[in-house]
C-alpha cells in the first residue's frame, strides 16, 4: 500500500506530519491509482473528528463516513469531481464511529507529485454552524408567522391587521398563510386592516387586489378597513380604485355590518 512516506520529502517529512497533526481540521490524502481510491494518509484532526483510529482508516475509501442522511446528490458531486480531477467543496452529513451524525464541510483538491495524482481532502466539522443556521431559520419563520396574525373575530369572519411594510417576501408569506388557513376555516369574510401600514405604493395596491382575487377563488370575500384620509389620498395618486371592494373605516364598523353566520 502506498503511504505518506512515498511522497519523498527528505528531512521535512516529520515536521510536515507534526504540523498537519496540530491543525484543527481533518486531513486525508487518497491515491486514485490504487483500487477504490483508498486513504494513504490521515492526520490526528481526522481521527479526533470521526473517532476512528488511524489503522481503521488507512486503506479505506472515504465513503465509510456516509450514512442514512448522507445526500446522494453531494456524493455524486464528489464522484464527478474526482473523475475529472477537479477541486470540489460540499457540505455533507457524515457519521462518526459511534454513529453520531456531523456536518462535514469537505474540500477536495487534486495534487500532482512527480506526474502522479493524489487527492487532498480537508474536513471541517460545521455542525454547530448548521445548528445556529437552523435556529436562525426557525426564528425568522416564527417572526414571519407573528407578522401575519390571522385573528378569528366570530364565526365565518377573521381579520388580518397589516403593520409595517408589505414587502414582496411578506406578501408571499401572507398568501401562503391565507391559503393554508382559509382552506380549512372556510371563512366567508376576511378583514384586512391597513391602518398600520407604514408605506403605501403601487406595489401595495397591486398586492391588495391580488389578495382579493385569491380570496374569491377560496370563496372568501375581502373587506378592507383602516383607509385613513392620508392613505386614501395616496391611493388616489396611485389611481388605485378600491370601489370594487367593501371598505370600512375600522374593523369594528365592518363587523357591525357583516351578517352573522
Curated annotation (Swiss-Prot):
Modified residues (S-4a-FMN cysteine): 62
Domain of life: Bacteria
Pfam name, any one: STAS
Keyword Transcription regulation (UniProt): yes
Keywords (A to Z) from UniProt: Chromophore, Flavoprotein, FMN, Photoreceptor protein, Receptor, Sensory transduction, Transcription, Transcription regulation
Residues of the STAS domain: 147-258
A GO term, aspect molecular function: photoreceptor activity
Domain PAC: 88-138
Consequence of gene loss (knockout): Cells lacking this gene have a twofold decreased response to salt and ethanol stress, and a somewhat reduced response to energy stress, indicating that PhoT is a positive regulator of sigma-B activity. It acts independently of both RsbRA and RsbRB (YkoB).
Entry-linked NCBIfam families: sensory_box (TIGR00229)
Oligomer and partners: Homodimer.
Function comment: Exhibits the same spectroscopical features and blue-light induced photochemistry as plants phototropins, with the reversible formation of a blue-shifted photoproduct, assigned to an FMN-cysteine thiol adduct. Although it is a positive regulator in the activation of the environmental signaling branch of the general stress transcription factor sigma-B, its precise role is undetermined.
UniProt name for this protein: Blue-light photoreceptor
Gene of this entry: pfyP
